[in-house]
Amino acid sequence: MTIPRIRQPRAVIDRKALTVVLEDLAATVTDNRERRARLLAVLKGALGDGRAEVRRRFLEEKGTGAAVFAENSHLMDQIIRLLFDFTTTHVYPRANRTIGEQMTVLAVGGYGRGEMSPQSDVDLLFLLPYKATPLHEQVVEYMLYTLWDMGLKVGHATRSIEECIRQARGDLTIRTAMLETRYLWGDRALYGQLKTKFWTGVVTGTGPDFVEAKLAERDERHLRMGDSRYVLEPNIKDGKGGLRDLHTLLWIARYIYGVSDMRELVELGVLSADAATKFGRARAFLWTVRCHLHYLADRPEERLTFDVQPAIAARMGYTDRNSGRGVERFMKHYFLMAKTVGDLTRIFCAVLEDQQKRRPILSIATLLMRKRNLGDFVLDGGRLAVAGRGAFREHPLQLISLFKVAHDHGLDIHPDTLRLVTEHLPTVTLLRNDAKANALFMEILTSRKDPELALRQLSESGVLARFIPDFGRVTAQMQFDMYHVYTTDEHTIRAIGLLHRLETGALRDRMPAAADAVHKVQSRRALYLAVLLHDIAKGRGGDHSILGAEVAMRLGPRLGMSEEETETVAWLVRHHLDMSRTAFKRDLDDIKTILDFTGLVQSVERLHLLLALTTVDILAVGPAVWNNWKSSLLRELYTHSKDVLTSGFQAEARDKRVAHKREELAAALADWPQASRERYLDLHYPAYWLTFDSATHLRHARMLRRARDAGLTVAVEVLPDPERAVSEVLVATDDHPGLFSKIAGAMALAGVNILDAKITTMSDGGALDIFTVQTLEGHAIEKEERIARLAKTVRDVLTGDLPLEKALRRQPPRLPERTRHLTVPPRVIVDNQASKTHTVIEINGRDRPGFLYAVTRALTDVAVQISSARVSTYGERVVDSFYVKDVFGMKIVHRAKLAQIREALEAAITQTVPRKVEEGAEQGAEKADAGEIVAA
């Protein structure tokens, strides 16, 4: 292997001049310790100067990663050569070396490939003809200690030729390393002997074994790294679609074909010229990104974490545009390159598998398969293939039917056929208005056999983006936040697979309501198409739900949907966020919430469809997003809405319902003295009786009596509810302004998240506040010591024994430091239409310790009473919804008061002086109704 020639190499390091310096040093300094110190200073200075020049060229002259790799490799080569010559000539000189004392220094690994990034290790192999002699040991030790003292990380091995061959036969890692050795200095003939023996004694006849082992190694690495190239913070080296996948291609190509560059495979007919060009572009892009990453982190960092993504995007020229943020455009380019690597890896490795892996004995299943009707296709080695190279040109429909037949029969597609698909992608555009092609696609999408794999194959091959260009626009599209784990296309395909699992009952334990609802759906085709299209318009600079509905209206007829089906799909896409917004942000005990939602849905069929779509949409966001609490909220909204849609709203008189609830509790408290019972019933206002069920009323009554009997001024009880993965915290004390905010602050100190809160006041001036909480990890609080600690923290804060403000300032950040670049525009929405009795205030901001305390204290400071709250967290973004009244118990309607509230809340969200921001950001879903104030 050789490295490319670099521009003005002596500006990086001048070995000739340094040789003169070292010769003079050896001649004038006789003390060994002093001489070594001076040698170290010279080499360390040369290394530092060289690295600075390489960095300057890269950053100031907009250089490439390829140039950095070549320049760093050249720099290190000269350092090694200078050190070797000085060591063997002046430190351990030997006039007449025997054959057994010869030595060669080889570069190995990334250094051997000439891919030396700014923070790469230096991997060396000291090659000997026979067993190591004392001279060898002295030279190697002197060189290694000098390199270590220079601050280099050196991986090293000292082996004879026979040791190299023996170990390469038995160890795949060593065998792979031997593939990319590069001569540095010493006896060149020795290296020639090693190469000859390696290729004849190790490689010959072992190609199939090597291919199998490297592909298995690749698969294991993918599983270890998450098995997806579409993750928020990808590993550029070891992640799927990263540099290690390209290395795998190179290793196999070199092992099987003896090539050192992928372009040589074009001449051999293994790779197309276009594929070789794509390989080069992907590698060059990843090299450049990796160099920026190493320079920014100043360490061998391989993950594109949130904190470096914006900086790298800016350095590589990705600026913000109307169509999206620069960092999102950069990451989209990264994911597209990772996809390209995946495409190349799949096709090339499949070709090699087909050529090199031992062919399996034909099973009975395969023999029977040959008798099945595969249409226009044939089996080649057990894989589905076209009948001839002109098949797609003569019959373009086969570009779709290929995937349908493979899906129906559970067959892999032959690599040569996949390569032909890639070559004929422009032909797919001719199929967009072909009725048969659209019908075939809908059969794949709605297949009773899991359609996820077929859709993924259509996407990976590039066919899906050509067939539905709107899908191509969201391919590799990411959102720069912690909530959306996958790119839009990956999220969508996962959602389709989850919908299939929901239908089969595989998810029934986690989401029973949705599993029941999906089987009651009449418009199954509409549901699957709605899932495919629900995020189709993301990244277009407007409300993606509205824009997506327009796409659905256009695509539906093309895909063979009836007018009714098309309207259903468009409605689902338009409203695919409304069910989760209502369930997670609104008070489900407020009948107007239910009536407004059912007024939107209008039919049980649409309710079933929307629940199924909402469920798989949330599940497909990421593995940690769904939880039992969200499941219970959606189930509650679904159940209440279904009751209204099937039976109608029973507008029983308010007084009658209150009286009925009081009578039920009175009966349950039969063991209480009558006077005590009546006194307790009179404590609560009508709203309390209508908010909770009878079992909850009884639990509250017994808790308040225990507190009174114990003479407690502050009573706290924690009730775990593992089934919903939450705990209920009851707090009883005297009512006073700021009570809610103090409890919220105490919860933050105790390390729990508030999900829901109900604030009730009593006629004797007492307060009973009910909080639904989780641990920061999303679990119920069940351990006794954790329960006791939470209760004590709340009590100590309310009694004044624990100074709240001071304690909150000591709280560590909620989010990792690397996420500091993830900003959330402060947003305050005041809605006077959502409830008949309350003003609803929704707040969006960046999560931090004490966030809920800060905003509730701000509400207290402007004389706003909180009746209930709902808290949701989406990665770094927190959304709090409050049902509030003014000091007179009325909705807040005056513009001046609303403006005061907005300014106070905005200051609390940002922890800065309130500032006016432009309204109408697309991130905020709802628009202001009449009388609401929005701070975007």
Swiss-Prot record:
Region described as Uridylyltransferase: 1-372
Activity regulation: Uridylyltransferase (UTase) activity is inhibited by glutamine, while glutamine activates uridylyl-removing (UR) activity.
Catalytic activity: [protein-PII]-L-tyrosine + UTP = [protein-PII]-uridylyl-L-tyrosine + diphosphate; [protein-PII]-uridylyl-L-tyrosine + H2O = [protein-PII]-L-tyrosine + UMP + H(+)
CDD domains in UniProt: ACT_ACR-UUR-like_2 (cd04899), ACT_UUR-like_1 (cd04900), HDc (cd00077), NT_GlnE_GlnD_like (cd05401)
Region: Uridylyl-removing, residue numbers: 373-727
Protein name: Bifunctional uridylyltransferase/uridylyl-removing enzyme
Entry text on domains: Has four distinct domains: an N-terminal nucleotidyltransferase (NT) domain responsible for UTase activity, a central HD domain that encodes UR activity, and two C-terminal ACT domains that seem to have a role in glutamine sensing.
Function (record text): Modifies, by uridylylation and deuridylylation, the PII regulatory proteins (GlnB and homologs), in response to the nitrogen status of the cell that GlnD senses through the glutamine level. Under low glutamine levels, catalyzes the conversion of the PII proteins and UTP to PII-UMP and PPi, while under higher glutamine levels, GlnD hydrolyzes PII-UMP to PII and UMP (deuridylylation). Thus, controls uridylylation state and activity of the PII proteins, and plays an important role in the regulation of nitrogen fixation and metabolism.
Chain residue ranges for the region called Disordered: 915-936
